[in-house]
Amino acid sequence: MRCGPLCRFLWLWPYLSYVEAVPIWRVQDDTKTLIKTIVTRISDISHMQSVSSKQRVTGLDFIPGLHPVLSLSKMDQTLAIYQQILTSLPSRNVIQISNDLENLRDLLHLLASSKSCPLPQARALETLESLGGVLEASLYSTEVVALSRLQGALQDMLRQLDLSPGC
């Protein structure tokens, strides 16, 4: 009897179909590690050393502040806003941080799907239309305030992940 490719495929099928799922604790650990990495990257930017996340700058109210309780969907929405802000900044300091935020959002989506609560698509920030004028007037302040508040928000997210946040 000639078996050919079909028999070989059937013989390999059990090996090909066996896929081991990544344990959710590993995804959560990766999420925490990435958050710590982003916080470290922000701290390493030289002009971020002495800035308070509570600093008030006129015209930058669209940059999210700190939230006491964060669900996975709120974390994703917050990160989406920061990602939009950082991608609109011309500074080279924020390119890697913006890429890391994209990866962090993907990890949050995995955590959410493990809890059977898929995250809604993050809405675009309506107030970013006025960001162009703010950037022209105060590019440095926008970067400093955005990174400072992002750092605080990430530290809040890190604490919330230890408490196993809901949807």
Curated annotation (Swiss-Prot):
Which pairs of positions does the record mark as disulfide bonds? 117-167
> What's the family?
Belongs to the leptin family.
SUPFAM superfamilies linked? 4-helical cytokines (SSF47266)
Functional summary from the UniProt entry: Key player in the regulation of energy balance and body weight control. Once released into the circulation, has central and peripheral effects by binding LEPR, found in many tissues, which results in the activation of several major signaling pathways. In the hypothalamus, acts as an appetite-regulating factor that induces a decrease in food intake and an increase in energy consumption by inducing anorexinogenic factors and suppressing orexigenic neuropeptides, also regulates bone mass and secretion of hypothalamo-pituitary-adrenal hormones.
Name the gene for this chain. Answer: LEP
Native source organism of the sequence: Sus scrofa
**Which BP terms does GO give this entry?**
activation of protein kinase C activity; adipose tissue development; adult feeding behavior; angiogenesis; aorta development; bile acid metabolic process; bone growth; cell surface receptor signaling pathway via JAK-STAT
Which positions, given as ranges, span the membrane?
none
What keywords are assigned to this protein? Answer: Disulfide bond, Obesity, Secreted, Signal
Signal peptide position in this chain? 1-21
GO CC, one annotated term: cytoplasm
Gene Ontology terms for molecular function: DNA binding; hormone activity; leptin receptor binding
Cellular compartments annotated: Secreted
- What is the protein name given in its UniProt record? Leptin
